[in-house]
Amino acid sequence: LLEKLLKKLKSDHQVINDVRIKGLMAGIEFKNNNTALKIYKDASKNGLVTTLVKGNIIRITPPLIIKNEELKKGIAIISSCLEQI
């Protein structure tokens, strides 16, 4: 589910350069550092905990027991932040 949601997010937003997924850990690589920093801060303000990596990558590491609805909500927060750019 995470891979499907992130690939859709990438196709909907041109500022995303790449998405990489390993299990439930995912990285969203943005085309520039400013965008990544803004999304990182905005997502945090909306209750989504992420990690900023290498300046232009946001890492998502949800718990293994996350429900599908919670995962969808987290990606929706990122999508909402991206729409404000």
Question: Would you name each region that the model predicts?
Answer:
Residues 1-85:
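Conserved N-terminal phosphate-binding loop of PLP-dependent enzymes in the Aspartate aminotransferase
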